[in-house]
């Protein structure tokens, strides 16, 4: 049983936990199978309409990511993915259909999932395939510009169709710490933060910052920024800033220092932090730091749309203390991160729209392609080799998070 067949049962489980919001994404190829068709696929549109209505039945607000590491293969093979400016028009057609069809069902939208990941996972982030001897850095930033312009167009179109729509950008967040107080390490950390912030600078402020323009000039990166691009970026900035946060990062200019593993963001191992099974360093205070950094910089509402712990959960043959899956490690991780964002809101004055953990149910991990790297409150009997019944089991964290929601975070 896949999510297509079981979404009603799964949404009922989310409602049992008390979900107020459910973050999901729309597969571009379900709406336009090739990506460049003139007319959408009604069957795909109807499927998502049914999903949204099922959410609404339980009082759950959909939070919809339009593009979540997916690009129709036809667009990659025929046009080169987001390297091609024609992608902007294909995307405009897609979002116009979505905003029109779901005008009364969806209010909160995210244009691109973790848009800065184009620099680290270019095929996932923008459908990029590089030819031999191709300037990959040039291709990444050309593609990024096309996505940024497309995002601004989506914001414009969304507000024209329904002024109540709330459109957000999204980044894979987590501040870089300098490994030492050496000025070179501090400078390196600033450079890495800017590398990621540039995407939000453009979407939240409406223009490329000077440091980015100087970087393009220095690196010989050239792409066409038309007057229309400048106008659309300037006048159609996002309503909120969403982000994923799993861990902070660390960097040094020194040699011989240990590196982190298991993450698309390569960095220096922080000796003050513990690590997950996959080498991601656990830093709840880093979430508070990241939130303050983003809010101070942009003064726009924030939305934490991914935060969680990937772990190798074990499904027991029989219940122990009432649970088939006892994931106290996940409860501990989420508890400390909830404390951190509560402090950011209550003590620091950060404007936070909401929090959606990653993920509510087990699914294949994007970073490793494994089912074994589980994040959900609900265990899905599916394994790396494809075996399993797909049966759902409530983990210990399911019941814990239900109490967290019911108490609005007071009972942790």
What is each of the regions a protein language model found here?
Residues 5, 12-15, 46-53:
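N-terminal, well-ordered alpha-helical segments
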Residues 6-27, 236-241:
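Catalytic domains of carbohydrate-active enzymes, especially glycoside hydrolases
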Residues 17-44, 64-67, 78:
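Aromatic-lined carbohydrate-binding/catalytic grooves of carbohydrate-active enzymes
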Residues 35-36, 46-412:
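Active-site region of glycoside hydrolase catalytic domains
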Residues 1-3:
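Short, small-residue-biased leader/transition segments that mark boundaries at the very start
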């Amino acid at each position: 049983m896949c999510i297509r067949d079981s979404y009603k049962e799964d949404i009922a489980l989310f409602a049992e936990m008390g979900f107020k919001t459910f973050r999901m994404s729309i597969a571009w190829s379900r709406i336009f199978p090739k990506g460049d068709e003139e007319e959408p696929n009604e069957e795909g549109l109807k499927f998502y309409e049914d999903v949204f209505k099922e959410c609404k039945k339980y009082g759950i607000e959909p939070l919809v990511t339009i593009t979540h590491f997916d690009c129709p293969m036809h667009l990659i093979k025929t046009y080169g993915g987001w390297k091609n400016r024609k992608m902007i028009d294909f995307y405009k057609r897609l979002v116009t259909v979505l905003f029109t069809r779901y005008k009364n069902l969806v209010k909160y939208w995210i244009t691109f999932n973790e848009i800065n990941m184009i620099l680290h996972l270019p095929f996932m982030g923008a459908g990029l395939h590089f030819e031999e001897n191709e300037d990959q850095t040039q291709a990444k930033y050309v593609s990024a510009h096309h996505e940024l312009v497309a995002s601004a167009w989506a914001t414009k179109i969304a507000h024209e169709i329904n002024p109540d729509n709330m459109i957000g950008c999204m980044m894979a967040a987590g501040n870089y710490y300098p490994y030492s107080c050496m000025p070179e390490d501090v400078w390196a950390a600033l450079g890495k933060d800017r590398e990621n912030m540039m995407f939000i600078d453009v979407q939240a402020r409406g223009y490329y910052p000077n440091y980015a323009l100087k970087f393009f000039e220095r690196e010989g990166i050239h792409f066409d920024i038309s007057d229309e691009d400048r106008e659309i970026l300037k006048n159609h900035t996002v309503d909120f800033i969403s982000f994923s946060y799993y861990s902070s990062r660390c960097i040094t200019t020194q040699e011989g220092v240990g590196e982190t593993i298991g993450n698309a963001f390569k960095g220096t191992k922080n000796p003050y932090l513990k690590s997950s099974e996959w080498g991601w360093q656990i830093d709840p205070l880093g979430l508070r730091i990241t939130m303050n950094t983003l809010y101070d910089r942009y003064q726009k509402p924030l939305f934490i749309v991914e935060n969680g712990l990937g772990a190798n959960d074990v499904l027991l043959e029989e219940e122990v203390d009432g649970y088939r899956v006892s994931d106290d490690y996940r409860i501990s991780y989420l508890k400390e991160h909830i404390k951190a964002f509560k402090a950011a809101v209550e003590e620091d004055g950060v404007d936070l729209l909401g929090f959606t953990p990653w993920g509510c149910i087990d699914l294949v991990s994007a970073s490793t392609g494994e089912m074994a790297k589980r994040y959900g409150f609900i265990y899905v009997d599916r394994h790396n080799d494809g075996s399993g019944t797909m049966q759902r089991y409530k983990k210990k964290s399911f019941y814990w998070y239900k109490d967290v929601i019911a108490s609005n975070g007071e009972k942790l």
